[in-house]
Amino acid sequence: NFQYGNATLSYYDPETRTVQNEVFFRANGMKLGDVAQSMIIRDGVGWVVVNNSHVVFAIDTNTFKEIGRITNLTSPRYIHFLSDEKAYITQIWDNRIFIVNPKRYEITGYIQVPNMTMESGSTEQMVQYGKYVYVNCWSYQNRILKIDTETDKVVDELVVGIQPTSLVMDCNNKLWTVTDGGYEGSPYGHEAPSLYRINIDDGKFEVE
């Protein structure tokens, strides 16, 4: 629950079909924090993005013990690895995507998002195709960004409906996003939700 600091991590064992709750707390003797937004596993390490605690924890997936953390983040949402020594972390309430070195748990730079204010900044999920990373901009936004990972610059963008909430790529290299349309009374506007399929090669909408 937002602002309650009661995020938890559970583990499901598919062989025994059992669930262990509060595994982070039991392994580390401290709460996970305020809003565990997302998690990925890479090479036996779990990366838990805790949004309103401004931190990303690295944990051993066998013991659930913390092995490191990335701090001084604004309000992190998702992490995407480019290599062992480089990753992107998206943010809400910030007009930057953070560049980090996961081996050193350090912030090494930023990607400035054009035409986005700090107060209404919102970058979310990331999908990679070749050297480009695509990012949907959610809260009070309507864009999908294209980032060149060699230069760490936004090189293009697609305008979609109001508030694209998620982003995936299918087996045919088609990019899909769905929008929530905002809400009634929103200063950014309100419309019916939409589903988009995008040809990644030419940036054209195939389903809208």
Predicted regions and their residues:
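Predominantly soluble domains enriched in secretory-pathway, periplasmic, or organellar proteins
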Residues: 1-208
